[in-house]
């Protein structure tokens, strides 16, 4: 059991946080967040962080570790997560990684590729092309060269679009080829529990309800406070988090409140679609439909079965 690591993964708004907190009442888990949005301080409402009450009863590692103007990579996540896993196991507990940043899960479990270092000349060329043709043009180019990577990143994620094209221009190989190649993998047994709502309409409705709740709780005011405290720019990695970009553009007068709301909900649904695409191809994952009554009981029973079998063996 010393090398067992449980991973609770799923799309946004599928019920991961509530389930993770419940699991802590049944098993000696310690939670590690796998969420590229929750790492940021002062970004609480829009990232759907666990409540203060939830964090008191179920502490999460890797939440509130970066300022909104800082960046954080998959490589940094792997270093932090592996260090935490080792410490948790040493204490006699079991790591439970919870989140929806599938690129982090993928990097952790399959190892990181040795990618070429950034090349200023190539980056400058891509930035000039973006200025003249637009980032949509570069995203379409990436879709033709590396459709697998393009399907996994947002069309407005300029940093990742640039990096994927940079890798291709430097090596002649696609980023997806690098990421799926053989890499050194950590010495853990990962148990992947995937929340996978079968009805998209159910998930879409939850996403809309949650976005409206965020707006009611002060999401717009949260973004205004970020602008007052930090030199916030729309191209920061933190502002790629769904909802934040749309509210920034609303505050800048680019569109009205209702358009902002519609765009925020649409962006969140697109995120969920990308997360489900990752999950659909995740080999060996145990799938649970989180819209079904009693799905949490099924997961608890499966975890207990796995732990019992591990101890008996």
From Swiss-Prot:
It is an enzyme of class 2 (transferase). Its cofactor is Mg(2+). ATP binds at residues 10-17. Substrate binds at residues 12-17. GO terms for molecular function: ATP binding; tRNA dimethylallyltransferase activity. It catalyses: adenosine(37) in tRNA + dimethylallyl diphosphate = N(6)-dimethylallyladenosine(37) in tRNA + diphosphate. The record marks 101, 123 as: Interaction with substrate tRNA. The keyword tRNA processing applies. Keywords: ATP-binding, Magnesium, Nucleotide-binding, Transferase, tRNA processing. Residues 35-38, 159-163, 240-245 are annotated as: Interaction with substrate tRNA. One of its GO terms (biological process) is tRNA modification. Its EC number is 2.5.1.75. Catalyzes the transfer of a dimethylallyl group onto the adenine at position 37 in tRNAs that read codons beginning with uridine, leading to the formation of N6-(dimethylallyl)adenosine (i(6)A). Monomer. Belongs to the IPP transferase family. This is tRNA dimethylallyltransferase. The gene is miaA.
